[in-house]
Amino acid sequence: MNSSLDFLILILMFGGTSSNSVKQTGQITVSEGASVTMNCTYTSTGYPTLFWYVEYPSKPLQLLQRETMENSKNFGGGNIKDKNSPIVKYSVQVSDSAVYYCLLG
């Protein structure tokens, strides 16, 4: 049985200045069992740390990943040096419905 899931990706900037910005994928609806890629691109004048957080309904924020120049190759699909860091969820379930945040620190 396929049911639709709503993923809401909010654009948010952490510790930002006018020279730092983050752009994320907007709201995404996918079928249960499908894969989804949530994109995060950024501009920064320095060497940032990029964070992905998730907020499930009625739950506090949870850290999904922390990415720096040193460890950016450890995460699938992205490279902080290329100023993008997508996150991929495979075989999405209804329980994955949440707000996903990409933050630049």
Curated annotation (Swiss-Prot):
Q: Record's InterPro entries?
A: Ig-like_dom (IPR007110), Ig-like_dom_sf (IPR036179), Ig-like_fold (IPR013783), Ig_V-set (IPR013106), TCR_variable_region (IPR051287)
Which residue positions carry a glycan here?
N39
> Disulfide pairs?
C40-C102
Q: Please tell me the species this chain comes from.
A: Homo sapiens (Human)
Q: Tell me the leader sequence span.
A: 1-19
Question: What name has this protein been given in UniProt?
Answer: T cell receptor alpha variable 40
Show where the Ig-like domain sits: 20-105
Its main localization is membrane
What exactly does this protein do? V region of the variable domain of T cell receptor (TR) alpha chain that participates in the antigen recognition. Alpha-beta T cell receptors are antigen specific receptors which are essential to the immune response and are present on the cell surface of T lymphocytes. Recognize peptide-major histocompatibility (MH) (pMH) complexes that are displayed by antigen presenting cells (APC), a prerequisite for efficient T cell adaptive immunity against pathogens.
The encoding gene is: TRAV40
Gene Ontology biological process terms, A to Z: adaptive immune response
**The organism's place on the tree of life at top rank:** Eukaryota
Write the record's keywords in alphabetical order, separated by commas: Adaptive immunity, Cell membrane, Disulfide bond, Glycoprotein, Immunity, Immunoglobulin domain, Membrane, Receptor, Signal, T cell receptor
Q: How does it assemble?
A: Alpha-beta TR is a heterodimer composed of an alpha and beta chain; disulfide-linked. The alpha-beta TR is associated with the transmembrane signaling CD3 coreceptor proteins to form the TR-CD3 (TcR or TCR). The assembly of alpha-beta TR heterodimers with CD3 occurs in the endoplasmic reticulum where a single alpha-beta TR heterodimer associates with one CD3D-CD3E heterodimer, one CD3G-CD3E heterodimer and one CD247 homodimer forming a stable octameric structure. CD3D-CD3E and CD3G-CD3E heterodimers preferentially associate with TR alpha and TR beta chains, respectively.
Any Pfam family matching the protein: V-set
State where the protein is found. Cell membrane
- CC per GO annotation: T cell receptor complex
